[in-house]
Amino acid sequence: MGLCGSKTQPMPSQTTTVATKARTKPINRDTVKSKQELRHKEKKDKKKKTQLKSTTVPVVQRKEGSKLTDTSDPSKNKVSPKEAARLAAEKRFQETNEKYNKGELGKKLAQERAKSHKTRLMEEAEKKHAERERENMIYD
């Protein structure tokens, strides 16, 4: 409990009154009239369902020997947006590669880009080893 004197809190010993709702008698569905109404509603629902079924079923004419899939579908040539973006990115990449790989310097840069980290380290180690051997050489 807080120390604030302006707030009053109900004590647990005080009783509170709860308003109860008046209960009503449930509806009796066993009467003859209600059964007839239910049957009548069911018949209407069945009629509606059969009408809906008959209107939504399209008439299909089949030819014997026809293929299930038609190879001349015009939508088959269309490409999804994701695929189109991928193709455009590949095209841009190839164009930039061709642009940079034309000259002699471009070819050397392409070779350097193609090398892995491991091959670069191996080349550096070979260069250092060659320098050490050159330094240790004895001239007569």
Curated annotation (Swiss-Prot):
Indicate, by first and last residue, each region the UniProt record lists as having compositional bias (Basic residues): 41-51
Which spans does this entry mark as compositional bias, Polar residues? 1-19
| Name the record gives this protein | Uncharacterized protein YGL108C
Its organism's taxonomic lineage begins at: Eukaryota, Fungi, Dikarya, Ascomycota, Saccharomycotina
Location relative to the cell: Cytoplasm, Cytosol
One Pfam annotation reads SVIP
Which UniProt keywords are given for this protein, alphabetically ordered? Cytoplasm, Lipoprotein, Myristate, Palmitate
| Additional remarks | Present with 2430 molecules/cell in log phase SD medium.
